[in-house]
Structure formats: C-alpha cells, structure tokens
C-alpha cells in the first residue's frame, strides 16, 4: 500500500561515493535533502581497493575538495598510508594516493552525513520513479513509501540487476554479498533510457597471519605527508606498510589450466569490463611473454586482518583461486577470507545526459557514478558532487554549474561521458586532459574554490584559506623578482647543485627558473623570506616560475579552445534541416544535442567540415535574427 512519506527539494538514491557527495552538496547549499540507501551499513563502502587517489584520480579528489566536497577531508581522517606518485616527472602528473582504513572511511562518512543539517538519511530500496509529463516528481520504495521532490539523483553504483560470478557459480547480488536492486533498471528502460551492461571485479581478501612478508618488498608511505584537503595544513600520523610480491610461472600454469572455468572465458559474461584494471586471467593471456606480474598486498584497515591482493582480480572458481594464490611468492600458506568475484550491472548510456548530468528526456532527473558508466570511487564522487550542485541550482532556478575541459579534470570527465560516451567502464587518467599543466592537483583551489563559493557551496572559511594562499603566492613572486643576489653569494650554492655560475647579479626569480635550483635550495641565500608563507604557496611559486613559458603557451591554447566553447548552439536547432551536414553528423548532433560548437567538434562522427557547416549556419542564423544586417 503506497503512502505519502514526505516532500523534499532533492532526493538522492544510493549512498556510495557519488551519493554521499551529491547529498552533502545539496544539503550544504540549503536544499532539504533525503538520502535513501538499501542498507545504512554500506555508506561510502569501498568494495574493491582500499585506496583513494592515484594518477589522474588524485586530481579529481583535490578538485572535489576545492569545490567543497567531502572525499578529501574524509580520506585525511582515515588514511593509513600516503604517497605522492610520479614525483620523478613534471608537476602536471604528480598524483596523491592514500591507503584508507575501509571501516573508518565508512563510519566517518556516515557520521558526517548524520550530522549534516538539511539532510535526512533513510534505509529503503527505491523500486519506482514518480513521473508526470516527462518530469520526475519523486520515488517509491519497496515498502510503499512515496517521497516527493523537485529533483532526484540516481547514484545506484553496481546494484542495478547486479550479478556475481565466481567460476561456474553465479547469483543475483550487489557487491560484497549485499542485496541487488532488481526493479529500478526495468523502470528506467520503460522510460526510454538506453541501458547497457558493464562488469567489474575484485580480488580475494586474505588473512594477514597467513602471509610471509619476509619474502616481499616493503613499501612505506612518504615521510612528509601531503593532505588531500586544502583545509588541512600538515598531518602527522603513524603509517603502515604495503608489500610488493610477484606471480610465478606456476601461477600462470594454474591459471591457463583452469581458464575454461573462468566466468569471463567460459562465455557466461558478455558485458564489458574496465580496460585499465584487467583480471589476472587477462594479464596472463594478453601478456604471455611476461614471466611474472607485480602483486601488492595492502591492509584493509587497522582493526582487521583482511589484506587486499591488488593485481589479482579474477572470476575463477574459489578452489582455483586458493591454488593460484599459493603459488605467489610469500603467499604459499595464504588463507582466503573473501573470494574474488566479477560483478555485472546495468548502467545508462551517458550520452543521454546533459553536461549538468540531468537526463535529457526526463526533467529534473540527475545521475552520477558507476550508473553513468565510470569506474572508481573518485570518478563517482566527482559526478555526484556536480549532480548535487546542479540539482539544487535547477531547484532554485539559477544558472547551471558546468566546468569545461580547461577548468578541471571534472570537466574532462563529464565532457568525455556526455559527448563521446563510453563502451567500457571509464577511468580518469592525466593523458585524457589536454591542458594538464594548468589542471595540476596543487592549484585545484586556485581554479575552483571561488567559483564554488559564488554558487553557495564552498564555506567562507575555505574561501579565506584560498585567498590567503593566493596573496602569499602573488606577494612572494613579486618579492622574488625584486630580490637580487650577487655572484659571490649565489655561486657557491649553484656550484653545489651543479648549475652554471653567474657573472653578474641575478634575481631569485630568474635563478629559480633553473631546473637544478629549487625553492628549498634558495633558502640558504634568501634571508628575507617570509617564514609564515604556507607550504602550498611555496610549491605553487616554484611551479609557476619554472614552467612560466609552458604555462603561457597552454593559456594561449585555452583561449583558442574557449572561442569554440563560447559559440553556443541553441537547443531548438533541427540538425536534419541543415544543408551540408553529413548524414552521420546530423544523427549524432541530434542525439547528443551539444551545448556549444566546441562540444560538437568532439563528437565521434562529426568532422571538421561538419563544424564549418555549423559555423556558417550559426552566422546565417545570427544575421536573420538581426534583420539581415552584419
């Protein structure tokens, strides 16, 4: 029996990483928000790897934080090891990665959600959407409760018609043995949503006491811990190690002899998995020339003996997993606590979404996370944050908040999804960003915090921290330009760091341009340095000065990019009626309905000649609107 259970501004369906960010963003912007999840015990659950960040993904976490999201803050509270990756390369690809304590990550996020004003958390399974005139009006739960709202955000993760595979065994399930959602996907299909089937997988968890760490290589965290959140200065914490080992020829033999029992190789699963996170079967088959593969043994938390076997995702039968693990160096006595599995699930074709993450043909219905075809906690959180923001802005009748490819990795992520779509679970990488020297993780607050404050999400305290850092950077760069040092003073330091000597006085600014000279090195000859300058500002000053020419070049490229992005395409355009457009271009443009000429140019199947036709059409349209004048 259905009953009216209440009215809200925004309803969020799902409490994974996308759902948490969506609900918190909506509530913090003043919207009366309801968050529904199938179980309160799975909030911000990490069903796969126990880490946050990494190459490309760390950039997303920093951007989420700069906008006012929670992932960075929660990771800083709960990490057990932290490392900055790619430090031997340029700053554009430096990426922070932290091992999180899974249980603490969940409990801390749950606590944050429970204590957030304007946000109500309830356990319930959503089985239907309330739709009137192609507009969502609310949701219906399995118990018959009808919750009404202005906007609904779907953040259902891998639960829609979830099915787990372990060798020849398969059964309907969500991740980690939780209940799947079996009804909502069918409803979405009836509403005209083009749903597809993706898959992902996770390795076994083994008992810590069954691992021989003496045969493995210890990997420690960084001594100087860099926080994810711009709200944190420095963090001191005792860290735990991870361990590196390798597969053996015997491992590969066990896999190949049982390949026909793998759910994927048996043909039981026809869905598409993540390209950049292949199963161990895939790695052994595709890279048969490699004698071994790296395996990392990672702790799941401080209060558990479970260890995550990174690099051994599989859908082989449990007894084969056991035999396979025992052939890995140091795992000869390994005891499985949770078997590895593959999981299939339904998700939406993201080209059906607007850049705001609103479903094009269902007004006020937004979505985020793996439901949109991505993989990874960070990609999910980024989308959830943007969906939450835009759901509130639409409720208020305000302009949407859309980041383009030159402003954020979040912009790259969403633009790729809604413009190009994806035929496999999408993963963020630094190589996807054209302007990565501008979109560094260290300057995410410089790029995004002020924008977020203007829409009512970033707090005043966050804005003030950003403004202080900004002033420190500006003042320090000015001071470095004005401060000259003599050859007598500078040359001993330059010689010590194998940099060419100077014959006349030179500014600290010009000295810092040299690759061998760091901001830290200059301290020895820089008596007037402001000791209170924040660490982040010091790092930014050095990057801005060292890469000045490259940054200026990229900014010029962005100016050209913006010219096409700023040419808006009216949504009422009939592309089938534009002479000169190729048939494929007409179909693709009609389906995706790009917001700008720039977005249109990135659609697969739209050629440069089609863009030229569009530009001519827009100019003709402008002249007609102006009465035929120029």
UniProtKB/Swiss-Prot annotation:
Main location: cytoplasm
The entry's keywords: Cytoplasm, FAD, Flavoprotein, NAD, tRNA processing
GO biological process, one term: tRNA methylation
Gene Ontology cellular-component annotations: cytosol
Assembly mode: Homodimer. Heterotetramer of two MnmE and two MnmG subunits.
Biological role stated in the UniProt entry: NAD-binding protein involved in the addition of a carboxymethylaminomethyl (cmnm) group at the wobble position (U34) of certain tRNAs, forming tRNA-cmnm(5)s(2)U34.
Binding site for FAD: 14-19, 126, 181, 370
SMART domains cross-referenced by the UniProt entry: GIDA_assoc_3
Gene Ontology terms, MF aspect: flavin adenine dinucleotide binding
Binding site for NAD(+): 273-287
CC cofactor: FAD
Protein family (similarity comment): Belongs to the MnmG family.
Protein name as catalogued: tRNA uridine 5-carboxymethylaminomethyl modification enzyme MnmG
Pfam family, one: GIDA
InterPro entries: FAD/NAD-bd_sf, GIDA_C_N, MnmG, MnmG-rel, MnmG-rel_CS, MnmG_C, MnmG_C_subdom, MnmG_C_subdom_sf
Protein location: Cytoplasm
SUPFAM superfamilies cross-referenced by the UniProt entry: FAD/NAD(P)-binding domain (SSF51905)
């Amino acid at each position: 029996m259905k009953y009216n259970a209440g009215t809200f501004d925004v309803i969020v369906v799902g409490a994974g990483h996308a759902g948490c960010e969506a609900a918190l963003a909506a509530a913090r912007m003043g919207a009366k928000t309801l968050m529904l999840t199938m179980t309160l015990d799975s909030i911000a659950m990490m069903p796969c790897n126990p880490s946050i960040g990494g190459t490309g993904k760390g950039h997303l976490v920093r951007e989420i934080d700069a906008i006012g999201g929670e992932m960075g803050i929660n990771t800083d509270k709960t990490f057990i090891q932290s490392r900055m990756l790619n430090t031997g390369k340029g700053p554009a690809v430096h990426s922070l990665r932290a091992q999180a304590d899974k249980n603490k990550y969940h409990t801390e996020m749950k606590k944050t959600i429970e204590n957030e004003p304007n946000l109500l958390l309830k356990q319930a399974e959503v089985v239907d959407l309330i739709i009137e005139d192609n507009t969502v009006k609310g949701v219906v739960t399995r118990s018959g409760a009808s919750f009404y709202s202005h906007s609904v955000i779907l953040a259902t993760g891998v639960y829609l018609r979830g099915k787990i595979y372990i060798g020849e065994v398969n059964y309907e399930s969500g991740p980690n043995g939780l209940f799947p959602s079996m009804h909502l996907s069918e409803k979405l299909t009836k509403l005209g949503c083009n749903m597809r089937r993706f898959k992902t997988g996770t390795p076994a968890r083994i008992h810590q006491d069954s691992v021989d760490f003496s045969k493995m290589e210890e990997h420690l965290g960084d001594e100087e811990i860099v926080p994810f959140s711009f709200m944190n200065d420095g963090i001191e914490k005792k860290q735990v190690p991870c361990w590196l080992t390798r597969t053996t020829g015997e491992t590969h033999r066990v896999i190949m002899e049982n390949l026909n029992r793998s759910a994927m190789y048996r043909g039981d699963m026809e869905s598409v998995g993540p390209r950049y996170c292949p199963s161990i079967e895939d790695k052994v088959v595709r890279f048969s020339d490699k004698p071994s593969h790296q395996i990392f043994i990672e702790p799941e938390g401080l209060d558990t003996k479970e260890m995550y076997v990174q690099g051994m995702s599989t859908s082989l039968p449990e007894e084969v997993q056991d035999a396979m693990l025992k052939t890995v160096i140091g795992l000869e006595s390994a005891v499985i606590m949770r078997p590895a599995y593959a999981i299939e699930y339904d998700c939406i074709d993201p080209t059906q979404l607007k850049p705001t993450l609103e479903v094009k043909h269902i007004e006020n219905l937004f979505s985020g996370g793996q439901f949109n075809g991505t993989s990874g906690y960070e990609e999910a959180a980024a989308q959830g944050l943007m969906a939450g923001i835009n759901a509130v802005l639409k409720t208020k009748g305000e302009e949407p908040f859309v980041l383009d490819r030159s402003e954020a990795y979040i912009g790259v992520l969403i633009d790729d999804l809604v413009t190009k779509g994806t035929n496999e679970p999408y993963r963020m990488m630094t190589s996807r960003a054209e302007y990565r020297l501008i979109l560094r993780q260290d300057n995410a607050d410089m790029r995004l915090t002020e924008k977020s404050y203007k829409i009512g999400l970033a707090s005043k305290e966050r804005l003030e921290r950003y403004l202080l850092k900004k002033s420190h950077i500006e003042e320090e760069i000015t001071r470095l330009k004005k401060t000259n040092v003599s050859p007598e003073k500078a040359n001993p330091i330059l010689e010590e760091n194998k940099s060419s000597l100077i014959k006349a006085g030179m500014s600290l600014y010009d000295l810092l341009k040299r690759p061998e000279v760091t901001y830290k090195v200059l301290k020895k000859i820089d008596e007037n340095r402001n000791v209170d300058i924040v660490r982040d500002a010091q790092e930014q000053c050095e990057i801005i000065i060292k890469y000045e020419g490259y940054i200026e070049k990229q900014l010029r490229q962005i100016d050209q990019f913006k010219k096409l992005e700023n040419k808006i395409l009216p949504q009422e355009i009939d592309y089938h009626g534009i002479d000169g457009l190729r048939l494929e271009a007409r179909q693709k443009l009609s389906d995706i309905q790009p917001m700008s000429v720039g977005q249109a140019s990135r659609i697969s199947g739209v050629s440069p000649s089609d863009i030229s036709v569009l530009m001519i059409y827009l100019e003709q349209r402008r002249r007609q609107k102006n009465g035929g004048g120029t």
